[in-house]
């Protein structure tokens, strides 16, 4: 009798084990199929966007670098993601992030004085306050919101210069960005010159770290994104390429050789934000940049991620 009970128990255990094995095998197989399907979908989307970005390059006679991250799904859209471009004034948003990283919010109330000799071309805010100075927070906001070049230089000085900026990014894992000069020389954008350059992928990752990652605490992230939401120079760029009910916070940049850039974090309704970096350049030094190129590239990104 005892042997019969043991036999029944053994049979039950065996059947249960077989069922679990079958379930695991089925579940594992299903997950593998699902993963392959998702990988295939992402690959298909990148192939489709690759063609569209290539067509934009031909249309505008320009070179594009694009990297976008859907922070909710980790889906990425990439085109020439590792090619170097002059970062131009996009650095101001990231340098402001470094400033916030290295200083308390109380430090933003400190008044910074400067002279007329410190002013450089395109300083619409700082040129009005030479006599009184500005708080560090006001200077950072002027750099990010109005792309004020003197404010950008003061930001650099407060974080150890261009090399201090580069060093801060290295600590965050960026092994790509090269920062060498102050405004306005950093906008020369000479083809083949790696000074003051980065890639769409590196910039997008840095922006993600500062705005939704762990590089800054919540309060400081909010300060940075509020400055970027008020950007006065981005209406015709990524902001123009996203649906009107999306919230956009961006920082633009421009330089010689038709350099036109925009980096942004955008919030679709009821979804996690999307990080977008779009960089562009042309072959001729005096070439005119195209805002429309950035707008249309942003539209390609949004259509692919929707």
Curated annotation (Swiss-Prot):
The active site is at residues 89, 185. The keyword Hydrolase applies. InterPro entries: Beta-lactam/transpept-like, Beta-lactam_cat, Beta-lactam_class-A, Beta-lactam_class-A_AS. It is found in: Secreted. It holds the Pfam family Beta-lactamase2. GO terms for molecular function: beta-lactamase activity. One of its GO terms (biological process) is response to antibiotic. One of its GO terms (cellular component) is extracellular region. Keywords: Antibiotic resistance, Hydrolase, Secreted, Signal. It catalyses: a beta-lactam + H2O = a substituted beta-amino acid. Belongs to the class-A beta-lactamase family. This is Beta-lactamase 1. It comes from Bacillus cereus.
